[in-house]
Amino acid sequence: MTKNKSVIKSGGSLLAECLSANRVKHIFVVPGESFLGALDAFVDRKDEIKLVNARHEAGASNMAEAYGKLTGKPGLAYVTRGPGACHASVGVHIAFQDSTPMILIVGDVSRNVRDREAFQEVDFKSFF
C-alpha cells in the first residue's frame, strides 16, 4: 500500500510550472517585492524560462509587445503593483491597439489588505 504524500507548492512555483508547461521561453520583468516568490521559482527554472530584466515597466511591456508582434506568440511582462502596473499600461495599450498577443502579470498586495488603501494598491479591474 502506498501513501499519498501531499506536496505543498507555492503560488510562484505553480505559476512557473504552468508557464513552462505552456512553453513560455521569455518573461520581460522589472523585479519587485510583490512577487519575490515567483522570481525565485523562475530562477529555479532558468534553463526553461529566461528572465529579461528591464529597467522600467514601460520598457518591459514594450518588449513583451514587440516579442508578441515579431513571433506571433504572446509576449509576457511581469511587473509590480501600483506605479509598476501604471507604467506597464503603455505596452498593454499598444498591444490592444495593434491586436498583438501579450500577457501582463502584475504582483499585488496581499488579500488581507486589499481594498484598504495598502501601499501602492491600485484597483486593476477599473484601471485596465
Regions found by a protein language model. Give the residues of each.
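N-terminal alpha/beta PP-like core and its mobile active-site loop of ThDP/TPP-dependent enzymes
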Residues: 2-128
